[in-house]
Amino acid sequence: MESTLSLTIRSQWLERHDDEHKIRRDDHRSPFQRDRARILHSAAFRRLQAKTQVHGNSLEDFHRTRLTHSLEAAQLGTGIVAQIKKKQPEYRDLLPTDSLIDALCLAHDIGHPPYGHGGEVALNYMMRDHGGFEGNAQTFRIVTQLEPYTEHFGMNLSRRTLLGLIKYPAFISQTRAASQPAPVSHQRQIKAKQWSPAKGIYDCDKALFDWVLAPLSETDKQQLNAMRDCPHDALSHRKTRYKSLDCSIMELADDIAYGVHDLEDAIVLGLVTRSQWQEGAASQLADCGDPWFEKHISSIGEMLFSGQHHQRKDAIGGMVNALLTSIDVKPVDGEFESPLLAFNAYLDIGMEKALSILKHFVSQYVIQIPQVQIVEYKGQQIIMDLFEALSADPQRLLPLPTRHRWELAETDTSKMRVIADYISSMTDGHAQRLHQQLFSSHH
């Protein structure tokens, strides 16, 4: 059944929204090689080099940016696919090509606004009555509409690539909490936790989302839209339950890059100490249920904090390899007709626990610490100030192409969306410079 399904589906998943007739001589590339090239050459991708992954206050240029993070995720993604092909050859025809998984990993962060989570919270607050703001929803919007590779359809990527980029296949109106906190009297008072965005696709992008899902049966569409258990209170967002096989591989690559490579950054930047590692991660990894971690955890700690670059690299490489090689493709716990949805890639249970310990450690000791949060808070204020100014007098302050889009937008909500699109596309430095131009008497 699976093989016939994959054969009947295949050609539709290669289609593009706009059927192109490009003037290209002897172009032998596959659709996914083209998709990868479009992403790689896009302005949105290049801007990732000026968006920081972990906001420390180090003077060194060693730290990872969102661009280097995406390159590492892509390397991990192709590594995951290669080892599944070896271990489970029966899934060879279903697995993404190297170009496809590469494309997904390279593109997965391009919707992230300046100043990371701080920027996301700021834009979500400012857009609270206009459909919200969320990084993954913005990624979908950039690749399907905003990146000017085509006139109307963004990068005009193939359908399977777009499906792979959709981590949360539901509309934000469906995942958003039943009620939202009261708006604050002054934006300095906003609490980031209360305004973290619901995950999903913007409701205004429904036509494009529907186009991506068009090859699926009605039952598959409904099932893909399913939520996890109901949230415990009216202020908690709902979470989607399913995603495509390609997306599950991309997400694992992203998580490993975050949990392991961002840990390396933190050690080098001096954000974490050996005793914090021992208490916050090593002690739990020692009994996470995975024999590799249980056996090697003490030598990993030695190497990570040895002060020797090559030893630290060896430890990081060992952890990455242990995680990669414990990933398998399995049927999902839901009835899907399309093989792209019926299977996902999973870490085995011990390694899943290990990765969640590492991610929690990075979050607690690297992301949530005051020196990082101060930079995020400042970024949050910069973004809200910019939004307030630009939305107060758009025809005066927006750059001409953006102003033109704003004038063409027919409703208040779509006008606000144009402003959110503009601000979210900025790099950290661009946002800071514009803020100085608008508000600093010293500029």
From Swiss-Prot:
InterPro entries: dGTPase, dGTPase-like, dNTPase_2, HD/PDEase_dom, HD_domain, PHydrolase_assoc_dom
Lineage of origin: Bacteria, Pseudomonadati, Pseudomonadota, Gammaproteobacteria, Vibrionales
An MF annotation (GO) of this entry: dGTPase activity
Organism: Vibrio vulnificus (strain YJ016)
Entry keyword set: Hydrolase
Superkingdom, natural source: Bacteria
One GO process term, biological-process aspect: dGTP catabolic process
Protein name according to UniProt: Deoxyguanosinetriphosphate triphosphohydrolase-like protein
Family designation: Belongs to the dGTPase family. Type 2 subfamily.
UniProt keyword annotation of Hydrolase present: yes
SUPFAM superfamilies the record matches: HD-domain/PDEase-like
Record Pfam families: HD (PF01966), HD_assoc (PF13286)
Domain (HD): residue spans on this chain: 66-259
